[in-house]
Amino acid sequence: MIKKIGVLTSGGDAPGMNAAIRGVVRTALSEGLEVFGVYDGYLGLYEGRIEKLDRSSVSDVINKGGTFLGSARFPEFKQVEVREKAIENLKKHGIDALVVIGGDGSYMGAKKLTEMGYPCIGLPGTIDNDIAGTDYTVGYLSALNTVIDAIDRLRDTSSSHQRISIVEIMGRHCGDLTLMSAIAGGCEYIITPETGLDKDKLISNIQDGIAKGKKHAIIALTELMMDANELARDIEAATGRETRATVLGHIQRGGRPTAFDRVLASRMGNYAVHLLLEGHGGRCVGIVKEQLVHHDIIDAIENMKRPVRNDLYKVAEELF
């Protein structure tokens, strides 16, 4: 029977992680459990930086971005001896189970711990929205608002200077954040892992727009696909129109979470605790059609590539 649980955040931070921690802590305490926070993710678990949390530990955090527990990337956690040390630290505190908030790398760690006898529940916290088995990850819609704000500002200055702007947006192998940002921001062109890039066609379309009197253009580009500055130079050379690249970078991860993310994170945190109380381990939570669901964490890892949103790409194609 579970009496003590731990909670940690791992990998890249996302707005709403604090709300998720709060959901876990408050629910666990309401159910008569003791709760421990692990600082700086799996690194802190390995180093034994674990502290008991109470209701006041999560007061006034629901509106704050980032994660007060801290986060860190710790690839060494793949090593068996490192995980054994982490488990030793869990045992010192009598922790029976763990809620892991993060992305795909965090899920892999949770899977490994579950296989070694420590039941874990994964909670999707990443702005990339690249986790299978959930319509939304915690932090995604908050990041979307941040990107839209940046695009709106870039459109103002691009219009003033008759400039083409390339906006590089996070997402890694998933174009969801770029796609939604492009539609909501009224971007003229979109380049994601799902669309790929036909550079000649892109330049031809831009030239057609200029010939029709288009004064500026915004191109939404998913990170890691290509060098945004190099693409800007190629477009400027071909069109004669000033072209600049803006890499939004880590600003997308910061800021206060939206109301949606606060509610989503709270619901998921609550649900994760109840799954542990029901005896589940090696599962991950999600939300599908507004309903909370849970899946085998292995399925989420092996099917990390989310289905392509062909319906939204069709909308984007007709609007651009």
From Swiss-Prot:
GO molecular function annotations of the record: 6-phosphofructokinase activity; AMP binding; ATP binding; fructose-6-phosphate binding; identical protein binding; metal ion binding; monosaccharide binding
UniProt binding sites for ADP: R22, G23, V24, V25, R26, R155, G186, C187, E188, K212, K214, K215, H216
SUPFAM superfamilies reported in the protein's UniProt record: Phosphofructokinase
Catalytic activity annotation: beta-D-fructose 6-phosphate + ATP = beta-D-fructose 1,6-bisphosphate + ADP + H(+)
Pathway: Carbohydrate degradation; glycolysis; D-glyceraldehyde 3-phosphate and glycerone phosphate from D-glucose: step 3/4
Positions with a binding annotation for ATP: G12, R73, F74, G103, D104, G105, S106
Amino acids binding Mg(2+): D104
Primary localisation category: cytoplasm
Protein function: Catalyzes the phosphorylation of D-fructose 6-phosphate to fructose 1,6-bisphosphate by ATP, the first committing step of glycolysis.
Subunit: Homotetramer.
Name of the protein described by the UniProt record: ATP-dependent 6-phosphofructokinase
Protein source organism: Vibrio parahaemolyticus serotype O3:K6 (strain RIMD 2210633)
Encoding gene, per UniProt annotation: pfkA
